[in-house]
A protein has these predicted regions:
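Cell-envelope and extracellular/periplasmic
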Residues: 10, 71-72, 197, 221
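Short, hydrophobic alpha-helical segments
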Residues: 213-228
């Protein structure tokens, strides 16, 4: 079965910026989904901030294998209830791909537990993304680097946790460098942060970027059944111990009593 993927877009500049509309007439989310649907292994649909429940209902998320997130101007407009909902699904095994300015999204900062801050400059400068982990599944089919003629610069320090893997490192025309492709795991869910994606440049029309995102969806897809009880913390009775066991010492909790949270 194809990997069920939602491309979530903030859809703000897509509607109110003529520059963005000229590059992505149907919105960035639609352009990304269309490129993903070129793959026989992916079935991509879209959701936007303005949809009811931001397009991320419990039922829809329950049937989603990978969620792609792009946000910029309206991070604080995302309801905390939806952020909690997405986090639960990531813990259960849904993959999450966070693009560009999504580093400041509520969901990414919550999952990272850090400010996710960085330095930046909007000057249309050249970016070269070096593949520093060439055997990683996310960069298969790519050359030694991806070159983008125009990009918004992101610079270090990038206040995120040390990743499981650093897949790409960017060099910018102005001299800065940035860790541009980072992998994480939270609970059963795989997370990939990918730096490029400023809305005033046709980055999501770039063939290398399109290939990388297809690879990233396949990497983030967890084939195992969802870990539905990931939040449960049962009190296991002494009678269920695997070896003979005698209770010793004073106790705080009674048999069958739930733990404190």
């Amino acid at each position: 079965m194809a990997i069920r993927t939602i491309v979530w877009g903030e859809n703000v500049h897509d509607q109110n910026s003529k520059i963005v509309q000229s590059i992505y007439p149907d919105g960035m989310h639609s352009a990304i989904a269309a490129s993903l649907n070129e793959s026989q292994f992916i079935s991509a649909s879209t959701a936007v901030l303005q949809d009811a429940e931001h397009g991320l209902t419990q039922a829809r998320l329950a049937e989603t294998d990978v969620l792609i997130w792009w946000g910029h101007a309206a991070h604080n407009d995302v309801a905390d209830e939806i952020v909690e909902r997405v986090q639960q699904r990531v813990w259960q095994g849904m993959g999450l791909i966070v693009l560009h300015s999504g580093h400041f999204s509520k969901i990414f900062r919550r999952l990272m537990g850090t400010p996710c801050s960085l330095t930046w400059r909007e000057a249309g400068e050249r970016e070269r993304l070096w593949v520093i982990n060439p055997t990683h599944p996310i960069v298969q089919g790519l050359g030694p680097f991806i070159e983008l003629p125009n990009a918004e610069m992101y610079g270090e320090p990038f206040a995120v946790p040390e990743p499981m893997e650093t897949v790409l490192v960017s060099w910018f025309e102005g001299g800065e460098v940035f860790r541009s492709g980072l992998t994480y795991q939270r609970g059963a869910g795989r997370i990939f942060y990918f730096r490029p994606g400023h809305e005033t440049y046709p980055i999501f029309h770039n063939d290398d970027v399109k290939l990388l995102l297809k690879n990233a969806v396949q990497w983030a897809h967890n084939l195992a059944p969802a870990w539905r009880d990931v939040n449960e913390a049962p009190n296991r009775p002494i009678e269920q111990s695997l070896e003979p066991l005698e209770a010793k010492g004073p106790r705080l909790h009674k048999d069958g009593e739930g733990g404190l949270r």
